[in-house]
Amino acid sequence: MTMLGAALLLASPSLPVLSVAMLDDEVTQPSPGQEARALSLVWPSDVKLVLETSPYEVVVRFDRPIKDAMLQAFAKDAGADLADLRWNDNSLVIRAASGRRIDASAQGRTLIVHFLPESQDVAAPSLTPSPATPASDTELELEIARAEADAAAGYPDRARRRLVPLAERYPDNKRIQRLLGDMEVAEGALVLGATRYREIAADDPFARQAMAEAGGNIMAAGTIRGGKVFSQVEGVLNALVPVGRNLAVGAGVRHVRSKADTVLGPTGILTDVVAHTTIADALATVQIGNTSRLELQGSAQVDEKVYGVGARLFAGAPERQARVLLAYRLPDVATPEQSTFGGHISRAGIGGTIRLTPELVLQADGGWNGYGLRGTGVRTRSIAVSGGLDYLFRRSSPSLAITYRLDAEYVNRTRLRPNGLPFIPLSDRENHSFQLVAGKSWSKWQVTGAAGWTFDRIGNTNGPTANISATGRLNDGWRLQASGGVSSISRPGISGRQLYLRVALTRYLGRF
């Protein structure tokens, strides 16, 4: 299940293992009294079809793929008889609607599917378990197929819950243990998944990479952000190592060079200001079960004596996750004034992500921000709101999705210096961005590109927003990431078009 795990882990739109037919929810479901129906699905060339059936579900495995359009046409013809249809390059799962039963048979390269009323018996079952294939084995294959379908549709937690009792019943079944490891990795329990890979002696590239990542990492990155009035160059070096199964600790250092056309200071308006900032970080991640984790951070801006702490809690599986954010005076150089005089930020926020369908994901976050400078408390307060949706409408290569993002901040208090200038001048901002996103894999590389438009409702600085990113494995222990683009999304204290470029090289420390 290497590709299955890989599809779940990619943050950008990936190439999912299984495709899903879109069904019409407005069609009236069939009643048990309706007559039986038979539909055919014909492969364009010779194929070997292996069927596994239950009263309400059919799993078909094949050695030649079938075109998506033919499966979508089959789903349309089935209409209200069909509850679910999912497929990949070598299997498909057909589930009957409520009040219906299902049976299937294979004749050469033709699959014949019968939809029957609940009360009607199946005349001639297509699959009778033989002594070589006991009923328990058939049931096991069906349950594994269900787990694979759930995982490929973007529900790794649901798949893991199916697999856990199977792993307890069949502890020596390496296929089940491998699938369970894939789900643990997809949910973020990397150490648990890597441990399971070692126990079954998995040696494929995906497993080796996961085992390498589980041992910690050292990462170096450089970022350039440029705008009309404010630009920054940032270098980062950090390391993270596991201490047991549920705890990882790390440390890092950041150096930022900032250049601002104008800065509001205690002596008036400063021009062409260049500032250098060095920040040291201490990090810890606590894994709480399979689906939750707590991230802790302590940071110090050593040249300005600004210190702070923060925490983020992620609760729940990726398909239904809640987030809580708390920060107290963490060093912050997001605005010209903060980068010049030593800035900090305090935050309290909450948010979440939910997958409504295999294609549609919603997310929303909101919170309070307090911006301050060295030697002072909060000088500017705001309420920040962000959210969006992702809709994946093409699963084959390249994958295609449309996205919407809201990025807004509403300032409710700004304190002034004795000279009448604000300590940190911020204004309301509300950005609405729409993008088309494409993703494609080449060998060891995943490339994602996005292009669209941002509407600035308050600042009226509408413009393009586009980016391209590439992530690749140089080998099992090294990863290279590069991304760049243009953004018209206004940031705190900065509006207008901005360019950015980021390159990161990561060395993973785990053994495999």
Region locations from a protein language model:
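Residue-level detector of intrinsically disordered terminal segments
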Residues: M1-T2, A21, P422
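Signal-peptide-cleaved, periplasmic/extracellular N-terminal interaction regions immediately downstream
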Residues: S12-A135, E139
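Gram-negative bacterial Sec-dependent N-terminal signal peptides
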Residues: M1-S14
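Gram-negative and organellar
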Residues: S126-F512
